[in-house]
């Protein structure tokens, strides 16, 4: 709220496509990475992701940014089998509200911040929980 005028200042919303294009150009940090499943997809809906865990295993993920992104988080699903409290063990999907980034999702959150939160969960739990054989898929 502008203290001098008593009015609310609204920042313009960046269109979904521009936002996702900016995220695509960033692509992650090598430990956490992501990109379009199909480089010709001008809807920016279907993405691939990967997370290099501390155990040296590269975990693959599928990411879907529907038309409500970034207002709502993308759907994220592990392709590589993993045992984590935040993952549905029957299909690999990240459970709703299982991570702080999901509980506190807002337009400033990104695909990268979501994947970083998953990486943090992996760092905390991979060695504590029995994991499926390397290379197994959901």
Spans of model-derived segments:
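UBC/E2-like fold recognition across ubiquitin and ubiquitin-like conjugation systems
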Residues: 1-138
């Amino acid at each position: 709220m502008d203290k001098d005028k008593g009015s609310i200042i609204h920042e313009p919303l960046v269109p979904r496509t521009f936002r996702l294009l900016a995220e695509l150009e960033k692509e992650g940090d090598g430990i956490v990475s992501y990109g379009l499943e199909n480089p010709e997809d001008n809807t920016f809906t279907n993405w691939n992701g990967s997370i290099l865990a501390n155990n040296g295993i590269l975990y693959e993920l599928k990411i879907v940014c529907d038309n409500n992104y970034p207002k709502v988080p993308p759907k994220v699903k592990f392709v590589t089998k993993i045992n984590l409290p935040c993952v549905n063990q029957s299909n690999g999907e990240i459970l709703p509200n299982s991570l702080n980034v999901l509980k506190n999702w807002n337009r400033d959150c990104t695909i990268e911040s979501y994947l970083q939160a998953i990486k943090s969960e992996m760092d905390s739990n991979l060695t504590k929980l029995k994991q499926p054989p390397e290379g197994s898929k959901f």
